[in-house]
């Protein structure tokens, strides 16, 4: 398989560091991107709900096929009623650039922004979802299946931690993606249907970026994507670097509580300087 050349591959030979407590997380993966080594693997091929980690796939397609300066117009489908769904406040008729929509998608996890991007790229959410599944397969992510561009709970919408690594590994090839996920805050101005200005004010949902959780000494967290729903639990995919600047991707799916998510991810990435 041509995928294996520059990718981490799951083998039976991974001996997990027993000092790392991942008891509260269903699936955990740590990959060394330089040596293409899997350093920690727990249930990384189990199919689980990704929640908003889905938005990484949405971002890849936007960056691959879209133009950052293009102006997007929101349809009535940006009005999402589901309780607890994170929204940045986009209303039907609002216009913003693709760059602004990507910031809303990745920093504040805006589900409304996800719909706006999907309709801009493909004309409809359903057609965009077909593209998500096609593109995922092209990345070798063969054990995941998407039903929407945002990750709100839906039957037959799932990923594996390993597929999430493959998808995130593709996303970080885009400079704009890295710039956005590393941002704690973003402000911009977009416009409503009448052309009146609206403020876009975003704050990172990632506690390693927004300062709500400390980062291990000798480790730099570049950024990542959070995901939280009752079905998915607490999820996080992260790009970090060790004290030599070598990059790592770490994934946790279905952690029981947000505090445990960051504690277990902290323990996981703290080990990168020991290898």
Where do the language-model regions lie?
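Penicillin-recognizing serine hydrolase domain
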Residues: 2-27, 124-275
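Active-site-adjacent loops and short helices of periplasmic peptidoglycan-processing enzymes
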Residues: 2-162, 166-175
């Amino acid at each position: 398989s041509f995928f294996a050349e520059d990718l981490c591959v799951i083998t039976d030979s991974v001996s997990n560091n027993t000092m790392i407590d991942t008891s509260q997380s269903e699936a955990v993966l740590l990959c060394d991107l330089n040596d293409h080594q899997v350093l920690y693997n727990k249930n990384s091929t189990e199919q689980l709900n990704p929640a908003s980690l889905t938005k990484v796939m949405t971002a890849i397609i936007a960056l691959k096929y879209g133009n950052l300066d293009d102006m997007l117009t929101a349809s009535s489908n940006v009005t999402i009623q589901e309780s607890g769904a994170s929204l940045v406040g986009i209303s039907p008729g609002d216009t913003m650039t693709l760059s602004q929509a990507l910031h809303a998608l990745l920093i504040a996890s805006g589900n409304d922004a996800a719909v706006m991007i999907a309709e801009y790229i493909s004309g409809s959410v359903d057609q965009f979802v077909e593209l998500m599944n096609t593109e995922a397969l092209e990345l070798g992510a063969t054990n995941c299946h998407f039903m929407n561009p945002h990750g709100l709970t839906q039957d037959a919408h799932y990923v594996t931690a390993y597929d999430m690594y493959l998808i995130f590994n593709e996303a970080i090839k885009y400079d704009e993606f890295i710039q956005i996920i590393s941002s704690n805050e973003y402000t911009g101005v977009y416009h409503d249907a009448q052309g009146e200005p609206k403020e876009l004010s975003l704050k990172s949902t990632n506690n390693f970026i927004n300062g709500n959780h400390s980062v291990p000494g000798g480790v730099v967290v570049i950024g990542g994507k959070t995901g939280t729903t009752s079905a998915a639990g607490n999820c996080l995919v992260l790009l970090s670097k060790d004290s030599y600047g070598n990059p790592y991707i770490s994934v946790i799916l279905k952690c029981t509580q947000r505090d445990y998510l960051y504690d277990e991810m902290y323990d996981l990435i703290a080990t990168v300087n020991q290898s």
